[in-house]
Structures are given as C-alpha cells and as structure tokens.
Swiss-Prot record:
GO cellular component terms, semicolon-separated: cytoplasm
Binding-site list for ATP: 7-15
Gene3D superfamilies hit by this protein: P-loop containing nucleotide triphosphate hydrolases
Chief place where the protein resides: cytoplasm
Signal sequence range: none
UniProt-recorded name of the protein: Cytidylate kinase
Amino acid sequence: MIITIDGPSGTGKSTLAKALAQTLQFLYCNTGAMYRTLAYARLQPDWQEVPLEDFLASPPFSFSFSKDSPLQAFYGDHLLTSELSSQEVANFASLFSKEPLVRAYMQTLQKQYATVGNCVFEGRDMGSKVFPHAEVKIFLTAKPEIRAERRLKDLPQGSLSKEALMAELIARDQADQQRECDPLVIPQDATVIDSSDLTISQILEKILPLIPSHLT
C-alpha cells in the first residue's frame, strides 16, 4: 500500500509522515531529502560544471532504503544529515528540481523504492505525479507565519528572521506552483488538512480512519 503526503514546506509533512509510518509500521520515504541530496552534490565544486547527463549517469551521491531502515542519503561515503537542512541547499533544490531530467531520474528511483513494501511517501508531487493511484493521498497546508516558525527551528539561530523566511517560503510556493514540470497541486482525490492549529496526534486522528482497518 502507498500513502502520499504532499504540500509546501513547513506544513509538517516530514513529522506527520514519520509518525504515520511508525504507527502503521510502514516504510517512510522523504523525497524532499532526495532532491536536497542531489542539490548538495551539485553544489560541490567538483560537480558544478559537469554536464547534467553525466552527473546523473555517474552520481557522487547514493541512497539506502530497506525494510529495516528509513531512507539514508550519502555523498560518497559520507552520511548526509544536517547538510540537507541548510537554506542554500533548500533554495537550490527548488531550482534544480525544475529540470525534467532530474525529476525523471528521481521519480524512477521513488517508484523502485515503492516495490520494497508498504510505504509513506512525502513530497510535493507524490500523489499528483509519481503515485497518482495511491490508495490514500493527503495534502497538508498551513498559514505562512506558522510555517516560518516551524522552519526556523531547523535553521541555525539568527540565520534568518521570521519575516525573511516567510517571504522565501511564499516565493518558493509560487515557484513550485508555477513550474512547468510537475507543479505543486492538490492531487485528485486527496484529503486536504490545514495543520496550522493541529498537533500531529490530531492530524493522525483525521488520517487513520482513511486507512483500511486491517492495516491499522
């Protein structure tokens, strides 16, 4: 079974997806982290001038995904963690993900991972493009000021003001919604949830009734 959770940054997708996967004992795949991994690798000096086709054909990054562990991203042999949370990487990932070659490459990987077992996929086009026939589709929204507060917690203290981050989030939304390749949209048949004033437990209470009873 595939469950998709889509929505813009700061709506709580990652926290919800992890909690839902843990509750159901499903696998969890953070596709945003996959795009940020590509962006991080592409920003490294040795790879900035390499043609995109060659970069993807012999990538300096890799992913580990199995029934026993969540998605892990590597640059060479180095496990990427906090590097993927920087605003520079996030901003470049937004630009880089517009490339049709990049999206096709990533979607192929994501579909391969879906064969491993029951999975919760989190991203921006999971229910609309990658898994349009997913059994359960969720689309999260939240007020811009709430999203900015959440994202600030992931950034080094003092790196950005709430107002500046809110402006970046709104600009990112517009870019994601207006891009020609797989824009951010509410998937057909998705359940839309505003997470602004809800805890993760409250959101789970809304979602779990959508899951077949034998899986909950």
